[in-house]
Amino acid sequence: MTMGCSSWFRVLVMWWLCLTLSVPAHAAISVVDDQGAKVTLAAPPQRIVSLLPSLTESVCVLGACGRLVATDRWSNWPESVRRLPKLGGLDDANLELILAQRPDLVLLSSSNRLAARLRALGLTVAELDAEDLPQVQRLLTKVAALLGVPQQAAVQWQVIESDIRKAQAMVPAAARGTRVYFEVSSALYAAGESSYIGQLLTRLGAVNVVSAQWGPFPKLNPEFVVRAQPDLIMLSATEAEGLVRRPGWSQMKAVQRGRICAMPPVDYDVLSRPGPRLGAAAQV
């Protein structure tokens, strides 16, 4: 017995439909977060709450900005996230407001004390942090996996590396070897040599006066910086005003010579966040 062309066509269509229906639209997603917790999703999340600016920015550069339903108060890039509901900050995120968003994934730092409570209420939570450049790459990789677009992490990291290399090529020879102190807080928390900021400065030819032995973001004695006598002081413009009133700081050569890089908030945000804009930060 032979089949006509139309019969063969119907068989092929049925065979294709069976294959299509037997394969799920999305394979389950499983990622181990930075606290060692296994985060499992049946499908890519569609209602994401991000409680850290670097995580918000990572979601967006990976093409999933439209899946964000709310963020922390400090998330301000890209422009579209400014319009999203704001749920508080690292220490005061509002639990009720988070629940009201009905998120299928909450992204936050392990420093946020809400993680355990959110899990107890049945929410899927991923705790992700980064203190150095390899950890920033790992953060991007894990966020991309959680979003269901794992291949995009490598693409975005290549963009970051390309931007850093371009910035390296722009640094004048005379500027290389500049001894830098980078302040992240007026409470004298500094970006050490082993932090992502410190590693970025090193790649740009600077010498960090806070060596790796002190850790990524150590709290320093005020006298430490005075004794270190950096050639350049970098900090947020909002913190620069009271610099000369610090005991002994008016005697520092960098202060006397005006070698103070007081960054406006928009630039400071780019440089201080361990996320996908670090390539742009190298060019600030």
Where are these regions (language model features)?
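Short helices/loops that flank or line small-molecule/ion binding pockets
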Residues: 95-103, 121, 220-229
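A ligand-binding cleft/hinge motif common to bilobed small-molecule-binding domains
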Residues: 112-120, 232-252
